A protein has these predicted regions:
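Extended two-metal-dependent nuclease catalytic cores across DNA- and RNA-processing enzymes
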Residues: 30, 56-182
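Domain-level signal for Mg2+-assisted phosphodiester chemistry and nucleotide/NA-binding surfaces
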Residues: 1-79
């Protein structure tokens, strides 16, 4: 019901924007901000049960949720933010493309702010990940940059060094239960 109530929709949109601002404000030297928005994944064509445990739960309000996301997207675009949304691509797909663009084309550092830590395999020497979806704020980077990031952040953010290849290898061997991949 909350997804259909106009007042609660406004509260939701405000919360999304305030949370985004709070996360961005943790970084002293932000040059650009880009947002990525999920689209219905191409993966469903190959595996019908992809994300089944998630989609069966959200299906009653999925259309209402998408309408809210479209309002957030429109607001962000009107304010001049970079917004990436590609039909058939999930947010993770777009984040991977952005990580390549920033690290290999522009040769700039990129911090991805997300609530989804299961994309840690895209981390590289120029790409790090800030997870702001819990009380325990987590930052993921390659081992060579752990000290640098620990000095950058206040102590309320836990900096974790990860080896992206090991994460990728684990997913290939064990599957990804969060996406219902055996």
């Amino acid at each position: 019901e909350a997804m259909r109530d106009k007042d609660k929709q406004q509260v939701f949109i405000r919360k999304v924007l305030i949370d985004a601002c709070a996360a961005i404000n943790r970084f002293k030297d932000v040059n650009r901000v880009a947002f990525v928005i999920d689209s219905h994944s191409w993966r469903y064509r190959f595996y019908q049960n992809y994300k089944y445990s998630l989609t069966k739960v959200k299906s009653p309000y999925y259309k209402d949720f998408n309408n809210l996301i479209e309002k957030v997207e429109k607001f962000l675009r009107n304010k001049g933010f970079i917004v990436s949304r590609v039909m058939g691509a999930e947010g993770d797909d777009l984040l991977y493309i952005w990580s390549i663009y920033f690290s290999q084309v522009l040769e700039e550092d990129l911090v991805i702010v997300t609530g989804d830590s299961d994309i840690r395999q895209i981390i590289n020497p120029k790409v790090s990940l800030f997870c702001n979806n819990s009380k325990n704020l987590k930052f993921f980077c390659i081992p060579n940059r752990e000290v640098e990031w620990n000095e950058y952040f206040p102590t309320d953010i836990m900096v974790n060094a990860v080896r992206p290849f090991e994460i990728l290898l684990y997913k290939v061997i064990m599957g990804d239960t969060s996406d219902n991949i055996p």
